A protein has these predicted regions:
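Beta1/beta-strand and adjacent pyrophosphate-binding region of the FAD-binding site
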Residues: 1-13, 31
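Glycine-rich FAD pyrophosphate-binding loop
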Residues: 22-47
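C-terminal helical "tail/cap" subdomain of flavin- and related membrane-associated enzymes
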Residues: 340-515
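Predominantly flavin-linked oxidoreductase catalytic cores and closely associated redox partners
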Residues: 122-276, 334
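FAD/FMN-dependent oxidoreductases across multiple families
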Residues: 229-231, 237-241, 253-340, 344-376
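Short beta-strand to alpha-helix junction loop
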Residues: 100-121, 255-260
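Redox-cofactor binding/interface segments in oxidoreductases and associated redox assembly factors
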Residues: 8, 167, 311
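N-terminal FAD cofactor-binding segment of flavoenzymes
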Residues: 40-89
Length: 515
């Protein structure tokens, strides 16, 4: 069997790439080798259910899946954070940060089984050849010729030869292991999680009318984070009617052996998050699964090669689930991979691009790793984390999303034009990241019970989410906006270094100026 592209792994990264390539080049020959079987079960399948703006744009707009997402998945009421107070027995007394209404530019809660089943059916309808329950036995990379993959499908041993090999096989890390590309991620965090077959609503934690009225849509639709020293607990709703619950922790502060079963995790929740434990207890009879990763984070020495192989998704880099960046990195990587493949098939020399894209992607990953280093010990402190969350939101919306939505991360000519701006930006990130790592725990009792509403107030009155809809007439206008956003970061950095509460700059929305 011959193909232009063979993708090892038919999960979210691999199927998304196949869909992306067929949309851009309908006659491209793609073979996908997936070890699992279809259809996948809904709910109790994979984590990574929470998407943010980049991933939502990639799946909905770039892959043209918005109709399915709107009909079969759930809208996301942003990220929501609750910080500790006393014994965490009264949620109304916890500092809360989150939106009271849906953002202008949407994000989604994705039932991974349901979404991947639909995506699988779409790529098959697009003409992609997909082998489910296919086990890769060997990969022979031939830089001077066509690569060859041997795999077992049912009782049959088969071979596919191809111009490009893409490893999207997740934690199997086929090419990374074959080529010795493993790299430590410098984070020591773990997670346990489970799904409940019920619509668990965290608003049921209190019948306080004023607290319940803070949000229009139910808090259930947020990715909810219950924060504490060295940990956070998530509650994420799924379109199938189930709820995903997880505990993520710093391995140096919490012992995975104390939560590596459902009963142990319940005991841990009773001690640290009693209201979360009580809410889960109501639905324990609906338990669908339980899984655990003791040490989930890692990087990669190289992800793209001029020898016509690429690594994407969790096969390459996985950082941390906090802020839900997993699918964003699928989007970034697949954009680079797709561009390399299509240019090569048009006869272009992609060797310089492969080196440049590899550098840009791994630098993106390095920046995000830096945002998490030394962070988990501060999770229990509302003042520090308010600063951190607001700062990181400007980084994400004002720079990362701005460049992605305008398709500039793989525009090397444009990146060359903003080299000075990116150097300023990187210096800012490192300076503030170092500050947060060194910052002492500063307590402010006045924060108890406060609500930072990210729908009604914005830093300096600018809704950076809404500004993602601005259409720029040319690159000069986009660069001007980028400089404005970096200027905002510079102003915030001064306050952060002086331990001044930057939430005081939250203001009602001012009208966005046209580009």
């Amino acid at each position: 069997m011959e193909a232009d592209v063979a993708i090892m792994g038919g999960g979210l990264a691999g199927l998304s790439l196949a869909r992306q390539l067929r949309l851009e080049k309908p006659d491209i020959r793609i073979v996908v080798l997936e070890r699992g079987k279809r259809p996948a079960p809904e709910a109790s399948y994979k984590v990574g259910e929470s998407s943010v703006e980049v991933a939502a744009h990639y799946y909905g707009e770039r892959l043209k899946l918005k109709e399915h997402i709107d009909a079969a998945q759930l809208p996301k009421l942003g990220l929501r954070f609750f910080f500790p107070h006393g014994d965490n027995g009264d949620v109304t007394q916890r500092l809360e940060i989150g939106p009271s209404d849906y953002p202008t530019v949407p994000s989604y809660q994705l039932d991974r089984g349901r979404f991947e089943n639909y995506l699988h059916d779409q790529v098959v309808a697009d003409g992609v050849t997909v082998f489910d329950r296919a086990r890769v036995q060997r990969v022979e990379l031939r830089p001077g010729g066509r690569h060859e993959i041997g795999f077992v499908h049912g009782d049959e041993v088969r071979t596919v030869t191809c111009r490009w090999v893409v490893d999207a096989a997740g934690r199997s890390k086929i090419l990374k292991r074959k080529l010795g590309l493993e790299k430590d991620g410098n984070l020591r965090n773990g997670a346990v999680w489970f799904r409940l077959g019920a619509e668990v609503d965290i608003s049921d934690m209190s019948d306080d009318a004023e607290w319940r009225a803070r949000t229009g849509p139910s808090r259930r639709f947020s990715t909810n984070h219950f924060m504490g020293p060295g940990y956070w607990v998530w509650f994420i709703p799924l379109g199938s009617g189930s709820t995903s619950v997880g505990i993520v922790f710093d391995n140096t502060m919490h012992n995975v052996k104390e939560m590596n079963s459902f009963e142990k995790s319940m005991n841990w929740l009773r001690e640290n998050e009693p209201q979360c434990a009580a809410l889960v207890e109501r639905y324990r009879d609906t338990l669908q699964d339980f899984l655990c990763y003791q040490d989930y984070s890692y990087s990669c020495k190289q992800v793209y090669s001029a020898d016509r192989w690429c690594i994407t998704g969790e096969a390459g880099v996985f950082i941390d689930p906090f802020y839900s960046p997993g699918s964003d990195f699928i989007a970034y990587s697949n954009e680079f991979v797709g561009d390399l493949i299509l240019r090569d098939l048009r006869g272009e020399d992609v060797a310089p691009l492969a080196r440049a894209y590899d550098r840009v992607f791994l630098q993106l990953a390095e920046i995000v790793f830096m945002l998490y280093e030394g962070l988990y010990p501060k999770f229990g402190n509302g003042f520090v984390m308010t600063q951190k969350i607001l700062w990181d939101s400007v980084i994400y919306l004002g720079v990362t999303c701005l460049l992605y939505f305008n398709r500039k991360w793989h525009d090397l000519a444009f990146l060359g034009r903003i080299d000075t701006e990116l150097a300023r930006y990187n210096d800012l990130l490192r300076s503030v990241a170092d500050h947060f790592k060194r910052q002492p725990i500063l307590h402010d009792a006045s924060l108890a019970g406060e609500y930072v509403d990210l729908t009604k107030t914005y830093l300096f009155g600018r809704n950076l989410n809404q500004e993602l809809l601005i259409e720029y007439t040319d690159d000069d206008a986009l660069i001007a906006k980028l400089r404005e956003n970096i200027g905002l970061l510079e102003e915030l950095a001064v306050s952060i270094h002086n331990n001044v509460d930057i939430s005081r700059n939250l203001q009602p929305l001012r009208a966005a100026e046209p580009a």
